[in-house]
């Protein structure tokens, strides 16, 4: 088995007519038998990456090879076969059929793959026993706890013995006892030739991982001194869809704030002159930059951490930062 190899992956989509890149140039090698944690807040690209790995979303460029097959090139019957035979997905909201019992839910992918009813039933029974739900086989989702429903979802995901397991926020909405049950189960799946990729914002899962991929940069120290940046006319200070940890105040010259459009063009949002600031939303809410900023002329900007900028502005409320109050004089 060749494991998982991601090379220079770029995912781009249109949001309100603008081009958004939640993933931009990602590369990653994962050995068979590994558990990979994708860590980051909402909106950082975790679910987008899972969708690409599952063959649900096609990237703009780059490649994803699993077991030495580039899944970004698969189409039609070959893509359907990959999704059915190679991938198992555990959804955040369980996605169980409420009218079916736990046993019947696990049988669904088996029957869809052409497995006989008797063989599907035996396989589903074995899997539910494996996830410690042997006595809950006849229970419907509404009669089960969140942790139990999640274990049914895991059993269903591995019904066809896929070599790639994708889990999206598997501990969301679970109490600490249910979380423990699910964590043990997920760790047990990453054995042999199987690769397990889990998207989460839950740092409690980190000790389980063989590999952790943070889809946002580590936050800088709040005590980091201001950073003065000098740029020539036409040079880019930061690009749309990238992550950042500094809020910038213009001290000299002018900057253009532009948004890249889905058709490849761009739209001028505003021109920032001395005393103006920008980049606060991404920093405060841990979101990718929503626009590209480049120097309209030779210019200078000073970058502040969120805490330092609050002090610079003379406010404590986030709302005051977003509403662009006048800067306090130094």
From Swiss-Prot:
One of its GO terms (molecular function) is ATP hydrolysis activity. A nucleoside 3',5'-cyclic phosphate binds at residues 210-330. Keywords: ATP-binding, Nucleotide-binding, Transport. Residues 4-242 form the ABC transporter domain. ATP binds at residues 40-47. One of its GO terms (cellular component) is plasma membrane. PROSITE patterns: ABC_TRANSPORTER_1 (PS00211), ABC_TRANSPORTER_2 (PS50893), CNMP_BINDING_2 (PS00889), CNMP_BINDING_3 (PS50042). Transmembrane segments: none annotated. InterPro entries: AAA+_ATPase, ABC_transporter-like_ATP-bd, ABC_transporter-like_CS, ABC_transpr_LolD-like, cNMP-bd_CS, cNMP-bd_dom, cNMP-bd_dom_sf, MacB-like_ATP-bd. One of its GO terms (biological process) is transmembrane transport. This is Uncharacterized ABC transporter ATP-binding protein Rv2564. It comes from Mycobacterium tuberculosis (strain ATCC 25618 / H37Rv).
């Amino acid at each position: 088995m060749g494991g998982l190899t991601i090379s220079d992956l770029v995912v781009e989509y249109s949001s309100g007519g603008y081009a958004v890149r939640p993933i931009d140039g990602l590369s990653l090698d994962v050995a068979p038998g590994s558990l990979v944690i994708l860590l980051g807040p909402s909106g950082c690209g975790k679910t987008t990456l899972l969708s690409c790995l599952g063959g649900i979303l096609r990237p703009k460029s780059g490649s994803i090879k699993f077991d030495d097959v580039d899944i970004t090139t698969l189409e039609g019957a070959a893509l359907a076969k990959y999704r059915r035979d190679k991938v198992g997905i555990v959804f955040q909201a369980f996605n169980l059929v409420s009218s079916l019992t736990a046993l019947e839910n696990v049988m669904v992918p088996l029957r869809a793959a052409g497995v006989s009813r008797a063989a599907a039933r035996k396989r589903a029974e074995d899997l539910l026993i494996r996830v410690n739900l042997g006595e809950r086989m006849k229970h419907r989702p509404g009669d089960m706890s969140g942790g139990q429903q999640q274990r049914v979802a895991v059993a269903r995901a591995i019904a066809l013995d896929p070599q790639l397991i994708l889990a999206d926020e598997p501990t969301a909405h679970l109490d600490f006892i249910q979380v423990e049950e699910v964590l043990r189960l997920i760790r047990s799946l990453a054995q042999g030739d199987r690769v397990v990729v889990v998207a989460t914002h839950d740092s409690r899962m980190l000790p389980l991982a063989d590999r952790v991929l943070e889809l946002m940069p580590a936050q800088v120290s709040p005590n980091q001194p201001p950073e003065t940046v000098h740029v020539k006319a036409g040079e880019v200070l930061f690009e749309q869809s990238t992550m950042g940890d500094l809020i910038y105040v213009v001290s000299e010259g002018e900057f253009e704030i532009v948004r890249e459009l889905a058709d490849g063009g761009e739209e001028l949002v505003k021109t920032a002159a001395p005393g103006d600031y920008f980049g606060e939303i991404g920093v405060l809410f841990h979101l990718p930059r929503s626009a590209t900023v480049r120097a309209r002329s030779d210019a200078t900007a000073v970058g502040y951490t969120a805490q330092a900028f609050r002090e610079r502005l003379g406010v404590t409320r986030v709302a005051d930062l977003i509403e662009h109050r006048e800067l306090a004089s130094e």
